[in-house]
């Protein structure tokens, strides 16, 4: 299993997605997991005023992603919350709540996170995969 960060999923919405990321996603598709934390982050992004023009397209895309991964969506549970609390107490400058919650999910399940933002997660000790660097 691999938890996929928002920046990886968002690559799919670009006009010219990075071929390395697309190849990585295709290769690992059966192992990919969608986090409810990522769903919240994507939803937040397209609710912002600057996304008004593309909101309908992003809503359809997110609905499709949720449907495609309905049996591979990771909820945020009490174990995740406990680990999040530990991480939040040690928070480094620049760490945001959603990243820490995603890291907590990965740590609780002992699985890696696929992300481009390796530096944001490295201090948590979570296993990381950067599809841009593979």
Where are the predicted features?
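Short, hinge-like loop/turn segments at secondary-structure boundaries
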Residues: 49-53, 91, 130-133
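Short, well-structured N-terminal submotif of metal-dependent ribonuclease cores
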Residues: 1-38, 47-64
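Active-site neighborhoods of divalent-metal-dependent phosphate/nucleic-acid chemistry enzymes
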Residues: 44-46, 68-116
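Short acidic-hydrophobic, aromatic-tinged amphipathic segments that line or gate anion-handling sites
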Residues: 74-75, 129-131
